[in-house]
């Protein structure tokens, strides 16, 4: 049988997780397409960059067909650091498509 303190700890954890999810969803819903965003992506190896560029390229498929062209477009807005990549100028929809690789989202003013 669980002790009252354990039950309280579990409930507190669940509420914290729900609050974080609600805050994240609410924050992303407020951001309209085209707002300038900065994201940090973990694991800045060649495969990660190629995968993220492919995801972004899919968003821009009508305008930009080649992955190499997209890399050139992103290169001005991409900063590769030791443990993550920073890409600026993305919309909320593009960030959501990246899923689990996103570490941090910051709205640029």
Swiss-Prot record:
Gene Ontology cellular component list: host cell plasma membrane; membrane; virion membrane
UniProt keyword Repressor present: no
Site feature: Seems to be involved in pH gating: 23
Principal location class: virion
Annotated Gene3D superfamilies: 6.10.250.350
Alphabetized UniProt keyword annotations: Coiled coil, Host cell membrane, Host membrane, Hydrogen ion transport, Ion channel, Ion transport, Membrane, Phosphoprotein, Signal-anchor, Transmembrane, Transmembrane helix, Transport, Viral ion channel, Virion
Site (Essential for channel activity, possibly by being protonated during channel activation, and by forming the channel gate and the selective filter): 19
Superkingdom per UniProt: Viruses
A GO molecular function held by the record: channel activity
InterPro entries associated with the record: Flu_B_M2 (IPR006859)
Virion surface side: 1-4
Subunit text: Homotetramer.
Note: Influenza B virus genome RNA segment 7 encodes the M1 (AC Q76ZA3) and BM2 proteins. Normal translation produces the M1 protein. The M1 termination codon overlaps the BM2 initiation codon in an overlapping stop-start pentanucleotide 5'-UAAUG-3'. Termination of M1 translation triggers reinitiation on the BM2 AUG in the +2 open reading frame.
Name of the protein in its database record: Matrix protein 2
């Amino acid at each position: 049988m669980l002790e009252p303190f354990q039950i309280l700890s579990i409930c507190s954890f669940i509420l914290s997780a729900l609050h974080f999810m609600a805050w994240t969803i609410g924050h992303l819903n407020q951001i309209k397409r085209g707002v300038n965003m900065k994201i940090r992506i973990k694991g800045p190896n060649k495969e990660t960059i190629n995968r993220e560029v492919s995801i972004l390229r899919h968003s821009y498929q009508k305008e930009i067909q080649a992955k190499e062209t997209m890399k050139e477009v992103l290169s001005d807005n991409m900063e590769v650091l030791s443990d993550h990549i920073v890409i600026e100028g993305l919309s909320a929809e593009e960030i959501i498509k990246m899923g689990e690789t996103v570490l941090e989202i910051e709205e640029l003013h």
